[in-house]
């Protein structure tokens, strides 16, 4: 009887026991790399497709041959990104740790609840954003913008208002699918939506002559198509059956858990988005503002293109880490995090080589103005260095999201970008003679310090504690944050994100 008894005790105490006996670390890492690649490759294609959609819209905007319309549309897009899209994108990320950990824990109905809660949250947030957008002209005029450009910006953003509703559904649905490692349907849906985007814009802008209104309506129409394709997939594939318990009044509970994750996630996203907007404003104060602002626009588009790759990897790592924590597998979560970091280092090297290879020809894809070409060529190698830090730190942000520690990530971003990077950028650009180059050296300082901070966090993470926190998150999310008087409130424990060991 002793042997069976020992076996029972071992099975009950070793919660990390895996059905596959003692795989080597190398084989586990290789298998994990395959799992990450399976999720991230379709996401990269999806990102490239959606990037091309934005470029198509800008091309039709440029073909209007109306400088005030082009300026107004560009200004409206920047305003929409800062005051609307960044907020909705950031808030939606709050559901990611809940969904990935719930899927790993096989508590599938919680995914449907998180989807309902987050969609409702974004719809509610769209109301004050809409009020702000309705007053865009007054706001722009208050800050000294040209009246004609403000009029055009108002036209564009008023016709973009329905997009807030569409984004309130699109963001949660994407996360809902990604959390289950379902990414190919996202790619197919984006492909067909972008394929239709060209004739839609041609019809609205060129054939019907709607001009700036047509560009805005074309973007909305494409998002309607994208949302429709995703809903069709969810319904006909049956993927919703094990995760959807129908519309439930429980979606009005559990908001404290969601908000404690959503608000730091939103802050983290906005801090990065707003950094580039501040950089553009600083360009206007440099020695040659017209050339530097134009070059900054090209370089921001370039970094947005490169960012698709580490961002997709970050989402994949977040999914894998969260799934394993939810499945009570701390060792596998650790392997997922370290494997993702290794892949991101290789990705950073590739991004640096790309920036170096195209530095002398990239700007000519956008302009023939020699001063702009010269500035862009000068800064691209610095961007390559930035990507050495950006790719790993973006991936490690995914580790923090998957382990439900967005507050820690937001604090790191705040300190590194605004207390390190911004002062360095201002000092080098305006007081040390580096001018335009100094702004990007400031970004390099921010990315480098951010990477070091993230590496320290990863090295000190206690994965056993993270498994415990994952269980608590699942309990609170299911029970609607009701305090039973014995278990410490989830959000207090989530605030203690220093659950790290040396």
UniProtKB/Swiss-Prot annotation:
Disulfide bonds: none annotated. One of its GO terms (molecular function) is antiporter activity. This is Protein DETOXIFICATION 49. CDD domains: MATE_eukaryotic (cd13132). One of its GO terms (biological process) is xenobiotic detoxification by transmembrane export across the plasma membrane. The gene is DTX49. Keywords: Membrane, Transmembrane, Transmembrane helix, Transport. It holds the Pfam family MatE. PANTHER family: MULTIDRUG RESISTANCE PROTEIN. NCBIfam families: matE. It is found in: Membrane. Belongs to the multi antimicrobial extrusion (MATE) (TC 2.A.66.1) family. Signal peptide: none annotated. The chain crosses the membrane at residues 41-61, 75-95, 123-143, 153-173, 190-210, 216-236, 267-287, 293-313, 338-358, 372-392, 414-434, 439-459.
